[in-house]
C-alpha cells in the first residue's frame, strides 16, 4: 500500500469514528406538552427551592409549545425539579417534583398542574 493510500485510509477511519461518536450523542432533555393548551412559558427550579430559570420556551422557534409538541431543554442537569407553567390567557400553574433524566422526555399534562392562579 502506498503512503498516500495509507494516509487516505487513516483519514477515512478518523472521519468514520467521529461520525459514529456524534451518532451516539443523546437527544438531550425534552419537555412534552400533554396539556390541552399551548404553553407560553416554562421555568424550572430545583424542587422546593423557588429559584426559577429563565423562560425556556424562548428557545423554541415560535416561542411557545403547542399541545403534543416537544421542547428541547438546555442548561438543566438531571434531577428533581418544580416547573412554573404559563399560558397565553395569563394563567400560571406549578408542577412539583418532576424527575428529569438525561437524554429523556418528561411530560406535563393537565392532571399535573397545581396552584393555578385562574
Protein language model regions, located:
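Asparagine-centered strand-capping/turn motif at beta-strand->loop junctions
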Residues: 29-36, 46
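Bacterial N-terminal signal peptides that target proteins for export
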Residues: 1-8
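Structural beta-strand segments of beta-rich domains
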Residues: 25-29, 69
